């Protein structure tokens, strides 16, 4: 459900993550300090820009790429990265394409990437860095140790944010069962959920860039977040105005800047509450989030429950017969819902103590 703002970048990072044959070849060139220019793609549009060089048409190998980079020209690889098509070639892109790069190699790489939409990699001889271009994207690959340090720092930050979110959500749980939740409590929980998910997105990019070396970070991340995003979406479904689409609201919240996310009044407007006091406005949940915590209750049954009772308190107050009348709920499931909500309430109240 997250908006993939940098989906293209993530795909690029996966191709050249540490441990991949392509990254091994790039690292070899970097260590040799020869510099290099590689283009990934074999479409007619790309091959039209290639002038001269040697037709290699050989299987890809990190050591082959390293040896071929000793020559001045560009190396053209097939789009599936299985073949080296040609080496020592000159790339001649449209010179009218604007670029803010300075070195000849990087200017060419930027223009070819913009003109063809292909991945072009420039390895600087003097600065000893690898720069990746694709369309309008430019990304400098960093050393694994730097990324690992940043990922660990982000995990520590995430841990603190998750602890705050848990406190906010636990408080909201208590208020929901007492039916005294305010708009302030709800938008605070939505805000905290989105803050956590933004850090998660950042860590996921680090994991992608680390490749094989990111497995431990990935395991720690999975342990920390569990069902944070799902709960955040259900929270929106519980409290947004009935005439609004929860998916559109979630996308809108994701599109907010960091400053806008801090504005609780702005968040309340997004879920449909305009010009009302946050602290004094009591709102009741529909029950999506709480009922979802009961084991073995299908989503279509939850939909039917909410459609019939409209509020969590009405579901809790309903008799077995009233629950049994809802489509998809028999006697056994009615008992499971009643007992499940009772156990949830007891557990939440015990956690408070």
Swiss-Prot record:
One GO term (biological process): DNA repair
Enzyme class: transferase
Entry keyword annotation includes Iron-sulfur: no
EC number: 2.7.7.85
Cystines in this chain: none
InterPro entries (UniProt xref): DisA (IPR050338), DisA_sf (IPR038331), DNA_integrity_DisA_N_sf (IPR036888), DNA_integrity_scan_DisA_link (IPR018906), DNA_integrity_scan_DisA_N (IPR003390), DNA_integrity_scanning_protein (IPR023763), RuvA_2-like (IPR010994)
MF annotations from Gene Ontology: adenylate cyclase activity; ATP binding; diadenylate cyclase activity; DNA binding
Pfam families per record: DAC, DisA-linker
Keyword set, alphabetical order: ATP-binding, DNA damage, DNA repair, DNA-binding, Magnesium, Nucleotide-binding, Nucleotidyltransferase, Transferase
Transmembrane segments: none
Gene3D superfamilies: 5' to 3' exonuclease, C-terminal subdomain, DNA integrity scanning linker region, DNA integrity scanning protein, DisA, N-terminal domain
The DAC domain, residue ranges: 6-144
Cofactor(s) essential for the protein: Mg(2+)
Residues binding ATP: 73, 91, 104-108
Catalytic function, reaction form: 2 ATP = 3',3'-c-di-AMP + 2 diphosphate
PANTHER family: DIADENYLATE CYCLASE (PTHR34185), DNA INTEGRITY SCANNING PROTEIN DISA (PTHR34185:SF3)
Role this protein plays: Participates in a DNA-damage check-point that is active prior to asymmetric division when DNA is damaged. DisA forms globular foci that rapidly scan along the chromosomes during sporulation, searching for lesions. When a lesion is present, DisA pauses at the lesion site. This triggers a cellular response that culminates in a temporary block in sporulation initiation. Also has diadenylate cyclase activity, catalyzing the condensation of 2 ATP molecules into cyclic di-AMP (c-di-AMP). c-di-AMP acts as a signaling molecule that couples DNA integrity with progression of sporulation. The rise in c-di-AMP level generated by DisA while scanning the chromosome, operates as a positive signal that advances sporulation; upon encountering a lesion, the DisA focus arrests at the damaged site and halts c-di-AMP synthesis.
Family: Belongs to the DisA family.
Self-association state and partner proteins as the record states: Homooctamer.
Name of the protein described by the UniProt record: DNA integrity scanning protein DisA
Lineage: Bacteria, Bacillati, Bacillota, Clostridia, Eubacteriales
Gene designation per UniProt: disA
């Amino acid at each position: 459900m997250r908006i993939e703002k940098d989906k293209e970048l993530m795909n690029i990072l996966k191709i050249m993550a540490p441990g991949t044959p392509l990254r091994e070849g790039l690292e070899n060139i970097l260590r040799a300090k020869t510099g290099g220019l590689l283009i990934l793609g074999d479409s007619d549009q790309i091959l039209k820009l290639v002038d001269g060089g040697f037709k290699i048409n050989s299987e890809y190998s990190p050591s082959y790429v390293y040896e071929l980079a000793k020559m001045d020209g560009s190396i053209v690889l097939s789009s599936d990265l299985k073949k080296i098509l040609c080496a020592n070639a000159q790339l001649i892109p449209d010179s009218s394409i604007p670029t803010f790069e300075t070195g000849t190699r990087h200017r060419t790489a930027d223009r070819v990437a913009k003109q063809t939409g292909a991945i072009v990699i420039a390895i600087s001889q003097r600065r000893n860095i690898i720069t990746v271009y694709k369309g309008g994207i430019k990304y400098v690959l960093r050393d694994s140790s730097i990324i690992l340090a940043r990922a660990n720092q982000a995990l520590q930050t995430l841990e603190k944010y998750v602890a705050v979110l848990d406190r906010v959500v636990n408080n909201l749980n208590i208020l929901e069962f007492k039916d005294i939740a305010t708009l302030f409590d709800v938008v605070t929980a939505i805000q905290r959920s989105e803050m956590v998910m933004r850090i998660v997105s950042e860590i996921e990019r680090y994991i992608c860039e680390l490749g094989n070396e990111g497995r431990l970070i990935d395991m720690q991340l999975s342990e920390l977040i569990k069902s944070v995003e799902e709960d955040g979406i259900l929270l929106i479904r519980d409290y947004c105005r009935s005439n609004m689409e929860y998916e559109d609201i979630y996308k809108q919240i994701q599109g907010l800047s960091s400053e806008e996310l801090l504005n609780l009044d702005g968040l309340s407007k997004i879920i449909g509450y305009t010009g009302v006091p946050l602290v004094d406005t009591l709102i009741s949940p529909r029950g999506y989030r709480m009922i979802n915590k009961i084991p073995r209750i299908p989503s279509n049954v939850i939909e039917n429950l909410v459609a019939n009772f409209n509020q969590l308190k009405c579901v809790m107050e309903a008799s077995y017969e009233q629950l049994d009348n809802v489509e998809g709920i028999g006697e056994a499931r009615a008992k499971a819902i009643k007992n499940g909500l009772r156990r949830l309430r007891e557990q939440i109240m015990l956690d408070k103590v």
